[in-house]
Amino acid sequence: MGTLGRAIHTVGNRIRGTAQAQARVGSLLQGSHHIEKHLSRHRTLITVAPNASVIGDVQINKGSFISYASVSRDLQYPRAMGMGQVRRFSEDVSHMPEMEDSDVLNAFKDLMAADWAELPSAVVKDAKTAISKNTDDKAGQEALKNVFRAAEAVEEFGGILTSIKMEIDDSIGMSGEGVKPLPNDITDALRTAYQRYAEYLDSFEPEEVYLKKKVEMELGTKMIHLKMRCSGLGSEWGKVTVLGTSGLSGSYVEQRA
């Protein structure tokens, strides 16, 4: 085995170690899901693994579950524009929730502007502080909770997508020199990952377009990287995008100001 081969093998071993540490989130790739509505008005997608199984080197224990993400189902945000205010293009499409508390608003802005592949600890701390503080801006806190839980789900699911890609790289080589048919477990993992991705995006309500676009931009790149490494995937993979649903006009980018 040459130097490059040993390096790839070492990377594969490290990734497998990481994958084993992610066993608690491995259930995203197996089983069915149902929608459970909580008193807090959050919608949580729960994925349950009916039988113990292994996806690559990720052990999925029987009955394991994960709170995949949650978004508000009944929060209605005002869309009316006041006299003399500037109306952005596609305002009705990507309207942001109104927030009165400055701490909640700043935490919301920082979270939407952060990289969800690995959430910065400072951003997480500020978000948790704003969510738990005593304030009259309950609607703002609910909106922040939705974004924070979505960010946590995207971070964990993105880690699984990365583990799948590394497993593929370890199997066929970084440059594809050992190209061969994918093992059935990886094929099943890819199929289930796309299903979870598509179902999650479809779950967003019209008033949550800003959050849907953020999720698409965070996970779309990882999904496309998987698509580029494999041939023969279904035509549905052509729908994966990193551009969001309606471009950037009125999107979270404006919240950085």
Swiss-Prot record:
The UniProt entry lists the main location of this chain as mitochondrion
Query: Does the record's keyword annotation contain Membrane?
Result: yes
PANTHER family, per the entry: SUCCINATE DEHYDROGENASE SUBUNIT 5, MITOCHONDRIAL (PTHR36139:SF1)
Which pathway, metabolic or otherwise, does it act in?
Carbohydrate metabolism; tricarboxylic acid cycle
Stored Pfam families: SDH5_plant
InterPro entries, per the entry = SDH5 (IPR025397)
Its keywords, alphabetically, are: Membrane, Mitochondrion, Mitochondrion inner membrane, Transit peptide, Tricarboxylic acid cycle
* Native species: Arabidopsis thaliana (Mouse-ear cress)
**What are the boundaries of the transit peptide?**
1-89
Q: Which GO terms describe its cellular component?
A: mitochondrial inner membrane; mitochondrion; nucleus; respiratory chain complex II (succinate dehydrogenase)
Q: Quote the protein name from its UniProt record.
A: Succinate dehydrogenase subunit 5, mitochondrial
The UniProt record lists the keyword Transit peptide: yes
* Coiled-coil portions: none
Please state the gene responsible for encoding this protein.
SDH5
Q: Name one GO biological process term.
A: tricarboxylic acid cycle
Kindly list the places in or outside the cell where this protein is found, as annotated in its UniProt entry.
Mitochondrion inner membrane
Q: How does it assemble?
A: Component of complex II composed of eight subunits in plants: four classical SDH subunits SDH1, SDH2, SDH3 and SDH4 (a flavoprotein (FP), an iron-sulfur protein (IP), and a cytochrome b composed of a large and a small subunit.), as well as four subunits unknown in mitochondria from bacteria and heterotrophic eukaryotes.
Membrane topology recorded in Swiss-Prot or TrEMBL: Peripheral membrane protein
